């Protein structure tokens, strides 16, 4: 084994893929998740599961007394619109929860922390594609919390000598993504197409996103767990954009997924949402240089894979909720 890793949020969309990647790379994996948004069946076979809130004493004690050498932190509140509506709740999970596990990590055997961060820290006005040194001016409480998280992780690295790496994701998509919210736009469109509902586009649909497939993100986490770290001279020193560098409009995603589904769909436009970024593309040359990582899965391959998963998942849900299946479970 290469060491023991705790993946917080490992029953969620991204975290479960990260946990799978660690298992494939022969790490001993424990997943901690409160299942508030994650699913128990997302936890990969071979991983130990601990049902606990990232803010709990149990989570802190697990890290303090366990033999984990890596803390991979994916537990988060990820809905930008929700963060605008309730910034206190957002910071409770995304900052206080992080601090709780950082305290456990420094009391235990953790030698490296890999933090899931976000391109939301950059805000609206940076030149595209955005590199890691760009000004930080987040326009949502979610983005502010992610930036604060990077500073806290950097501080723990400086104070306690823990190696730290922050991964700033662009817009991640792929199997197991929640269909709710703009962050899951590919899953939301796929679900609508499978169920015969209209595609809801917030605003005019000309806003752009840098779409990165979840398997590429999982690979970046393994690279971040193994790389040599550079001196920690500032918050950007060990931060890496995990992205493709390409802009894709929401309208294009709607059209491309309609083509994959073989169904013409006219989007239904809704008002723009507070906190949404107009354009986004992140430069990933630094990750290529320091981590030896690059995105490999194109939209041409990633969109059909995601749509197939949503369609198959819809079929599984239908079978689980069919009258005969319900009666069988009751017997």
State each model region's role.
Residues 148, 152, 156, 189, ...:
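Hydrophobic alpha-helix immediately C-terminal to the catalytic Tyr-X-X-X-Lys motif of short-chain
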Residues 13, 38, 78, 180, ...:
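Short alpha-helical
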């Amino acid at each position: 084994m290469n060491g023991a890793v705790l993946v917080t949020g490992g029953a969620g969309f991204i975290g479960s893929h990260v946990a799978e990647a660690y298992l494939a790379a022969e790490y001993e994996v424990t997943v901690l998740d409160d299942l508030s948004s994650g699913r128990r069946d997302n936890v990969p076979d071979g991983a130990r599961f601990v049902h606990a809130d990232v803010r709990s004493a149990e989570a802190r004690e697990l890290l303090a007394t366990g033999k984990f050498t890596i803390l991979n932190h994916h537990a988060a509140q990820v809905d930008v619109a929700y963060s605008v509506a309730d910034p206190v709740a957002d910071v409770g999970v995304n900052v206080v929860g992080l601090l709780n596990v950082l305290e456990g990590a420094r009391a235990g055997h953790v030698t490296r922390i890999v933090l899931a961060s976000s391109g939301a820290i950059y805000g609206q006005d940076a030149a595209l594609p955005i590199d890691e040194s760009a000004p930080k001016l987040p326009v949502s409480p979610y983005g502010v919390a992610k930036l604060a998280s990077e500073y806290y992780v950097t501080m723990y690295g400086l104070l306690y000598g823990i190696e730290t790496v922050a991964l700033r994701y662009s817009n991640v998509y792929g199997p197991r993504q929640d269909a709710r919210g703009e962050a899951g736009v590919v899953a939301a469109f796929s679900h609508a197409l499978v169920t015969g509902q209209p595609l809801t586009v917030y605003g005019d649909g000309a806003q752009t996103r840098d779409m990165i497939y979840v398997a590429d993100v999982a690979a970046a986490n393994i690279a971040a767990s193994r790389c040599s770290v550079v001196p920690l001279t500032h918050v950007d020193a060990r931060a890496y954009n995990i992205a493709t560098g390409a802009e894709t409009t929401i309208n294009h995603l709607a059209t491309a997924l309609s083509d994959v589904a073989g169904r013409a769909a006219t989007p239904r436009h809704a008002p723009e949402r507070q906190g949404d970024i107009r354009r986004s593309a992140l430069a990933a040359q630094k990750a290529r240089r320091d981590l030896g990582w690059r995105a490999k899965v194109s939209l041409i391959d990633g969109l059909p894979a995601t749509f197939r998963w949503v369609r198959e998942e819809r079929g599984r849900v239908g079978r689980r909720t069919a009258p005969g299946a319900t009666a069988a479970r009751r017997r």
